[in-house]
Amino acid sequence: MKKTFISKQAKEFRTKYDIANSRVQGIRSYQKSLIVEEFKEFIEAEGHLFRESDKLHEEALKELADLVYVCYQYAENMGWFLDEALCRVHESNMSKLREDCKPIYREDGKVLKGPNYKPPYLQDLV
């Protein structure tokens, strides 16, 4: 099965920043906390505009796909070019390395912005 650019970018980021894939509860909880963190940030910004089993993994995948799907639907409704925005955000995320090309981590493992960080330019997409 061919991977989409989003999948390739996610793998590239995790590889570059040495973030291992794991089904361990603690790792899953951490990843979920990042999704919640980003979701809360989206809700805040938008407000300014006015068990370990295959079945459980399947359900989690479905919910994650639903989240991505509704994000694409929101972007389409707003006339935003989400694919291009994702490419630019990915480039920005890949610029977080220190001068020695090593990542900077927060205590909980989140990759932080280094001195080479360049925020994505998205103004032309809105």
Regions found by a protein language model. Give the residues of each.
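Flexible "arm" and connector segments at domain edges
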Residues: 1-64, 68-126
